[in-house]
């Protein structure tokens, strides 16, 4: 059974005013110093600075079951909230700030170079995603997985969609984070590579163009991890509910296992161009699960419920083998019935027309057990 791990980028807000709080770097520093002073072990959790001061990232220890993943996410969010409290803040699972924000760059030489190169893109770039790492056996298997998961990543994005607001406005998108993130020139879907060598050649060609500063700026929707034997699926919004995060991560683990078995059996990767996948992802970003998604078998729009049923059917053998099918099906049904985080944010705003209510509602859901 493959291990899988989660990283969440979380928005840092003032515990009293609920406005974004530019103290992420200090919160991480104080968290680290507190553990060093007491000699306590953070238990495999890693809290690190992110691009802007109004956020930081939590990396959770890898797990093998959905149940353990859920408890890990809940504990990690509580740990992050404790770190935020050291600077008078809270952390909330919001991919974008609902209200207007001019974020503050973390003082870091690399980030400063990125800012100098990419200008206004950096000045507005405050987004929080969630990334899923799934264990792979070799570089060849890793790239084979990337080639085959591509067509399903818009569905993953739709399930996670949780960012309708940007700079104080309802964008009409379910995931505007994905739109904002795709301002980066290396972001988005990739074409089929075919081999690990071809993947490395593609990376080298992008880096030789002199636009991305380093391999860390190759922001593909899915990529081979530089530091661990994993593939990293990067398409999802950070989710309000820990249960949704755990289930989406579980779906991605099952997807990786399914396509790895297909590769081992000699089945070819679906040859859908990246330019077409961009449109599939755009639709997922625009509507989430509220309208039609693209059926990967036909390339045509179909009701979201039908596309999700097809996704679950495709993964059913692995989910059943791992004993996770029942919980996953129930959670996906809940998302279809109650909506993703985007619907819940809009409902919170509609009640009184106050963006601060979006944040307070999101805080309650983020830390609900």
UniProtKB/Swiss-Prot annotation:
One of its GO terms (biological process) is modified amino acid biosynthetic process. ATP-dependent carboxylate-amine ligase which exhibits weak glutamate--cysteine ligase activity. It catalyses: L-cysteine + L-glutamate + ATP = gamma-L-glutamyl-L-cysteine + ADP + phosphate + H(+). Keywords: ATP-binding, Ligase, Nucleotide-binding. It comes from the Bacteria. It is an enzyme of class 6 (ligase). Gene3D superfamilies: 3.30.590.20. NCBIfam families: gshA_cyan_rel, PRK13517.1-1. SUPFAM superfamilies: Glutamine synthetase/guanido kinase (SSF55931). Its EC number is 6.3.2.2. One of its GO terms (molecular function) is glutamate-cysteine ligase activity. This is Putative glutamate--cysteine ligase 2-2. Belongs to the glutamate--cysteine ligase type 2 family. YbdK subfamily.
């Amino acid at each position: 059974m493959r291990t899988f791990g989660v990283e969440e980028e979380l928005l840092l807000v003032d515990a009293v005013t609920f406005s974004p709080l530019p103290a992420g770097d200090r919160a991480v520093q104080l968290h680290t110093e507190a553990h060093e002073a007491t000699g306590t072990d953070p238990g495999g959790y890693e809290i690190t600075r992110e691009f802007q001061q109004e956020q930081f990232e939590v990396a959770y220890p890898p797990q093998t079951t959905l149940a353990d993943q859920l408890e890990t996410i809940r504990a990690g969010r509580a740990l992050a909230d404790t770190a935020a409290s050291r600077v008078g803040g809270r952390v909330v699972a919001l991919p974008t700030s609902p209200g207007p924000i001019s974020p503050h760059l973390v003082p870091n030489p690399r980030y400063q170079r990125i800012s100098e190169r990419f200008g206004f893109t950096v000045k507005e770039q405050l987004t929080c995603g969630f990334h899923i790492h799934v264990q792979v056996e070799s570089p060849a298997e890793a790239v084979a997985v990337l080639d085959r998961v591509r067509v399903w990543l818009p569905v993953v994005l739709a399930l996670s969609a949780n960012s309708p607001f940007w700079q104080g406005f309802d964008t009409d998108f379910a995931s505007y984070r994905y739109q904002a993130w795709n301002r980066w020139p290396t972001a988005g879907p990739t074409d089929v590579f075919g081999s690990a060598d071809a993947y490395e050649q593609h990376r080298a060609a992008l880096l030789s163009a002199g636009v991305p500063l380093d391999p860390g700026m190759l922001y593909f929707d899915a990529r081979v991890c530089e530091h661990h034997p994993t593939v990293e699926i990067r398409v999802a919004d950070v989710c309000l509910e820990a249960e949704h995060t755990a289930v989406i991560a579980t779906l991605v683990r099952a997807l990786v296992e399914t396509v790895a078995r297909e590769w081992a059996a000699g089945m070819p990767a679906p040859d859908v161009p990246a330019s077409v996948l961009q449109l599939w992802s755009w639709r997922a970003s625009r509507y989430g699960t509220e309208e039609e998604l693209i059926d990967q078998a036909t390339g045509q729009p179909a009701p979201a419920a039908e596309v999700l049923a097809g996704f679950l059917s495709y993964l059913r053998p692995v989910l059943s083998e791992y004993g996770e099918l029942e919980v996953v099906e129930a959670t996906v049904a809940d998302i279809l019935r109650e909506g993703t985080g985007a619907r819940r944010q809009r409902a919170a705003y509609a009640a009184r027309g106050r963006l601060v209510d979006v944040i307070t509602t999101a805080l309650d859901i983020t830390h609900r057990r």
